[in-house]
């Protein structure tokens, strides 16, 4: 499995295991979570993607309960903060909102460290752009989180280029990634400047929902599904692996985040790295996704 360098102290596996729905599994036992992580490690997938809000603010603890020192030393943990929703530890709030204040960032970091039973976060992301963000306050807080050793690196999620530039202007530490939605179902970042912005900066993006939340395989686009099936059959992999390989083929060094609770599916995540994707194949899939040929 290829690895991507985000800064001088942090590398992550090219494919990332997403734990968004880990709390939705009928089995959240320590043994089952450990089996999921081990299935990832067997393929060279060492990076686990979390967020404080996942599972109604319970997913981090589910992972933490399963982390032995040996497992912790083999993985990188990504987590996110700034979404406050009326559930879990925020059940008393009256409205869902974003909070990028220093106080909230530090409280969130402490919660994450305690729930996951770890002494540092490998990568902390601001989960969503906050309309009330004071970029100097937020930037200084992120700088402090890194300087204190509580996070090895910081980044953002769902930021547009202007959101990124604003926050970065208030920081000394370099942001190392932007986790955005990208897939054959959501391909606008390839043309709206989001990827171009990150490429210009030399920043590897992360891609959430790289299979369109499963909609890719249930859409009315039969042409796209047939192309994925044909390419997969020729290379001995399933359609999902081909769809993820489409992202891997882009020169921006995209890190797809794949989430599933099915252990057999987890064991196949690494297949995407085996797929060969030339330019014509890439554009054949893109054409089907667009619904028309390129101009």
What residue spans do the PLM features occupy?
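Short, acidic/polar
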Residues: 27-40, 100-116, 162-165
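N-terminal small/glycine-rich loop or linker at the start of catalytic domains
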Residues: 7-25, 78-96, 125
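Beta/alpha (TIM)-barrel catalytic core signal, keyed to glycine-rich beta->alpha loops juxtaposed to Asp/Glu
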Residues: 3, 129-295
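Acidic (Asp/Glu)-rich catalytic clusters
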Residues: 7-8, 65-76, 113-117, 146, ...
